[in-house]
């Protein structure tokens, strides 16, 4: 059963599709190319046991720091790195304090496009078809817009001095396998990964 089916089977919400919020990338005072490069890197992360376990699996030292202290934390070497989507790296000018942007794509951020199940189920079949078609179109257009936005953000970061590199993602995936499995078990979604 996929996430969409699980939500729709719950009877409270009806999932019409998914929107993209970009992918999260590493940025910091040094680049990372392979899992070995993460060793002892103090990286600012969200306050989450699961998030910390993933970065620890890479050998990094996950550190909690308020978002509004992130820029100065990089400048003052309180942290070595952080992670966010390209749009926020650009808007907050994090590439100035942490000029190395390594394209880890470690978190693919999505948002669900939802409607109340009662409302959806009250529609006629024809109305449901209209809603479904409109939602499919909206999701497709939004994902294309988001991709374009992220592509432009990446180019602007480069134009303003950000140093961008690709990463050996296979080494990261392998290093995080146990953390991913533990997280899936903890939140009860192991079947979605299998």
Which role does the model predict for each range below?
Residues 1-3:
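Short, small-residue-biased leader/transition segments that mark boundaries at the very start
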Residues 5-194:
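N-terminal secretory/targeting leader peptides
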């Amino acid at each position: 059963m996929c996430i969409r089916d699980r939500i729709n089977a719950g009877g409270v919400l009806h999932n019409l599709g998914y929107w993209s919020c970009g992918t999260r990338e590493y940025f910091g005072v040094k680049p990372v190319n392979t899992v070995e490069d993460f060793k002892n890197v103090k990286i600012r992360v969200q306050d989450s046991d699961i998030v910390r376990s993933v970065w620890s699996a890479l050998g990094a030292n996950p550190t909690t720091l308020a978002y509004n202290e992130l820029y100065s934390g990089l400048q003052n070497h309180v942290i070595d790195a952080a992670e966010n989507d390209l749009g926020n790296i650009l808007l907050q000018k994090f590439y100035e304090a942490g000029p190395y942007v390594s394209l880890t794509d470690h978190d693919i951020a999505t948002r669900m496009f939802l409607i109340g199940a009662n409302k959806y189920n009250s529609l006629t079949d024809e109305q449901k078809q209209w809603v479904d078609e409109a939602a499919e179109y909206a999701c497709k257009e939004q994902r294309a817009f988001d991709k374009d936005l992220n592509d432009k953000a990446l180019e602007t970061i480069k134009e303003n001095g950000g140093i961008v590199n690709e990463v050996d993602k296979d080494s990261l995936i392998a290093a995080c396998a146990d953390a991913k499995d533990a997280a899936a078990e903890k939140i009860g979604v192991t079947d979605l990964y299998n």
